[in-house]
Amino acid sequence: MLGRAVLGLSCSVTLALLAWFTRAQTSDELKHWTKLGTGVYRTNENPYTYALVSGDGALLIDATVPPDVVAELGAKRVEAVLLTHHHRDTARCAEAYRAKKVPVRAPKESGDYLLPEGVAKFWKESVPLRNSRTAYFVLPAGVEGVECTLTDGKSFTFGPWSVTPVAAPGHSRDHFAYLVEPAADAKGPRYLFCGDALHSRGKLWTPYTTDWDHWTEVGLKPTAETLRALARLNPTHLLPAHGPAVREECAKVLTDTADAVDEAAFMKSYERYTKQRLKDEPRYDFLVPREQIASAGDKPWSKVADRLWITGNTYVLQSKTGDGVFVLDPWGQRSADQVEKLRTDEKLGPVELVAFSHAHYDHFDGIHVLKGGDKAEVWSLDTVAAPLKDPTRYRAPFLDPRPIQFTKELKDGETGTWGGYTLKFHHLPGQTFFTSAIETTIDGKRCLFTADNFFHQDQFSGTGGWMGLNRSFPAVYGTSAKKVLDLAPERVLAEHGGPYAFSAEDYRRRVKWGEAAGKAADAVCVSGSHRWDWNPHRVEFEPHLQTAKPGARLAGVIRVHNTSDKSQAVTVTLAGRGVVTDATETLTLPPGARKELTLSALVVATDAKPGRHVIEVRTRDASGSEGCDCFFAVDVTP
C-alpha cells in the first residue's frame, strides 16, 4: 500500500462500481485500457492515463479519464492520482477525482498553475500578456485540494512497487516523471512514466512549450538535460503521455532525443551558428558607439546621420521640409523624456509623425506619454496596427491593454510621404509576425529600418531565436533575410542600438541559418514540420478577450491555419463550462489553407457569475491528439 506518511492518506476512497466490475477484467475484455505488464495499464486514447493496480487499489499517473473508467480494471479504490505536470490535457479530470475525495498529488512547482488562487492570478495577468514568460495549457479554473507537495527523489511504495518522483523540467517548468520498479526485485522491469518529457525517439510533444522566453534556448536546455538524466535511470519501459510505449533501447531513445534537442537549441542563435558552425564570425560595421547596443534608451542620443538619431529602441528623424520630427518606436516615459531633450538640444520642431515597427510594448507604449503625440499622425503597417488598435483581439506577448488609434495603416509595399521622405512599408516577420520594415533614403543613403529583426546582441540577436507564441519561426526569419538581401539597402537601421552598414554576405548567411534552423526544429517535431508543431496559433479564437453581461450574445470567430505541408482534419470543440454555449465543428484543410468559423450562437449563461471566465477551445487532429493551446476569456459584468 502507499506509504501513509508520504501520501497523507488517512483512509481509502471507495469508488461506486457496478457489480460486474468487482473482478479484474482480462485483456480481451478491456474496453478503455491496454495491459502493458503485470498490474500496469494504459488508456487506449491519448493523452494517456496509466494505472498501477494492486489488489483492490489503483494508483493513477495523470488524469485524462474520469473515475468510472478505472472501474473496468477491477479496482475498488483509486488510492491517489499523480500528475506529471499542470497541463490541462493530462490533468483534465483532476477535479472529478477530487470530487470523489481521491487524493490528487502534483509536483511542488505546479501550485501556481493548478490551485484556484494561482490559476486565477495567472489568467488575470495573461490576458493581455505583457511579457513572454508564460505557461501553456493552464486549466480554465483551478482545482481545490490538489496536494502540490511532491519532491524530486522522495520514494514511496504502492503494493509491490517502489515509486520515485523525478524532476523532469523542459516541457514545462513543473514537469515530473515517475520511476516505478519492483520494491523487492532489483532485476524486475523499470517503468518510467515520462509524461511529455518525450514523445518518441527524437520527438517532442508541442515543442513550443519549451519556449520559456521569446528567443533563447532557456527551455530547450533543461529539456535535453532532463532526457539525459532520465536515460541514466536505465528504464526498461518508457511510457509517455502522448507517444507510443518504448520497450527497447530506452536509454538510447532518450539520449538520441537529447541530441536532437541540443541541435535545435544550438540553432536558436544565428550568431552562434555562424561563429561556431560556419567558422565565419559576422563583421558588423556599426554606425553608432557600441554603448547603444542592447541599451534601454538610457544612453545619450547617438547621431546616425545628419538628420537621424538613436537611443535604445527609438529613432528620431528630422523633416527635410521643416523642423518637425518623426519618432519611430517610442518606449515608455524614458523615451518620451529623451525625445523632449533631443528636441531642446537640437532645436527641433514638434513631433509630427509616430510609427511603430512591431507589436512589442517596448516599441510603442511611449505614444501614451509622448509630448505632442496626441496631435501627431500615427502610421504603421496594417499587420502591426491590428493588435495595437485592438489588444484584446489576439493572443500575443508584449502587448499593452491601451488601444492606439491610427491615422494611416499601410499595406505591404505601400508608401507614404512625410517631411520630404518617401517611406515604404514592408511586412518583415521574424522576432514576431507583427513586424514591419520601413525603406527610405536618408542623407543620400538607402536605409532600411528592420525593427528587432537582425539587430546584434552577441549570442542571441534579432536573428533568432524563435518562439511559437510570438508567431516566430526560423523559416520565417530566413524568408525575411532574403527580402533584405534583395532590397540591398546601404544601411540596416536595426533597433536596440544596433544600426550598421549592410553586408550582403552576412545576409546570405542569415538565409542559410534560417534553412538550417528550420530543419533542426523540424527534426524534433512529431509531424516533421515546425510550422505546425511549434505553433500554438494554428487554431485561434478571436477576440481573445471580451466583456459581456449574463444572457448577452458574444462575437466569435475560430480561425484554423494549416501551416503544414499535409492535409489536416481538425475537430474544434468549444467547452463552454456552463458559462457560454458549447460548439463542435470538424474542418478539413489542404496544405497552407486557412478557414474560419463564425460562431453566431454564443450566449453567456444567464446565471454566469461576475468575473473572468476562461473558455477552452479543444482541437484534435486526425491522430486524435490535442496539440494546440487555444482559449479565450470572457469578463462577465453584473
Residue spans for each PLM region:
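Short acidic, flexible loop segments centered on an aromatic residue
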Residues: 565-579
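Active-site HxH/HxHxD metal-binding segment of metal-dependent hydrolases
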Residues: 66-157, 334-416
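Asparagine-centered strand-capping/turn motif at beta-strand->loop junctions
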Residues: 560-564, 605
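Metallo-beta-lactamase
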Residues: 57-58, 155-158, 162-267, 324-327, ...
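Conserved beta-strand hairpin/beta-sheet module of binuclear metal-dependent hydrolase folds
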Residues: 29-73, 177-196, 295-344, 437-456
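Low-complexity, acidic Ser/Thr/Pro/Gly-rich terminal tails and inter-domain linkers that flank the onset
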Residues: 518-549
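Terminal connector regions
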Residues: 606-638
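Intrinsically disordered, low-complexity Pro/Gly/Ser/Thr-rich segments with frequent PxxP/GP/PP motifs
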Residues: 579-606
